[in-house]
């Protein structure tokens, strides 16, 4: 019996569009509003999507709050307004994170439907697998028993999917 440790390189080897740049394109097409918030309020240097998981902690909350207050007729910062508009802030922060996670699940499920243009040789079905991927490439294309696969970050194909995306600095506990 062998032990395989599988990461995104495995899906990339099979020509699956599974980079975070591919996810960026998916979000941009699916929801330009959420995409715009990400581009504007995260520490966006052009490389945000390259280090997507790490950069999730870089939300510029103060700029977001100032912009929301201005859009509601305020001057950009008002301590008293913070409490009154708390549901709006939650929508823009937690709501966007939740939507982003839902898009991640949709995107991975779409990846799971794609055919492989080539197959990695030498995968032994009776082996054990540790997978850092969200995709079901091993199950779908190599017919690996799901009981032989430990999905470290979750499996998007499961009905009650709870993907782990990002870092341990997620104060909202969404990712």
Mark where each language-model region is:
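SIR2/sirtuin NAD+-dependent deacylase catalytic core
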Residues: 1-175
């Amino acid at each position: 019996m062998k032990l395989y440790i599988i990461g995104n390189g495995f899906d990339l080897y099979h020509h699956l569009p599974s980079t975070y740049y591919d996810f960026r394109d998916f979000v941009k097409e699916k929801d330009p509003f959420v995409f715009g918030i990400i581009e504007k309020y995260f520490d966006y240097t052009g490389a945000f999507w390259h280090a997507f998981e790490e950069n999730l902690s870089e939300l510029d909350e103060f700029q977001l709050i100032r912009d929301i207050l201005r859009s509601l007729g305020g001057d950009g910062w008002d301590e008293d307004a913070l409490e009154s508009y708390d549901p709006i802030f939650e929508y823009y922060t937690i709501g966007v994170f939740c939507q982003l996670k839902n898009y991640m699940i949709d995107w991975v499920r779409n990846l799971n439907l794609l055919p492989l243009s080539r197959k990695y040789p030498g995968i032994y079905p009776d082996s054990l697998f540790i997978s850092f991927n969200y995709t079901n490439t091993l199950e779908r294309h190599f017919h690996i028993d799901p009981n032989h696969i430990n999905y470290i970050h979750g499996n998007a194909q499961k009905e009650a999917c709870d993907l782990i995306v990002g870092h341990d600095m997620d104060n909202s506990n969404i990712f």
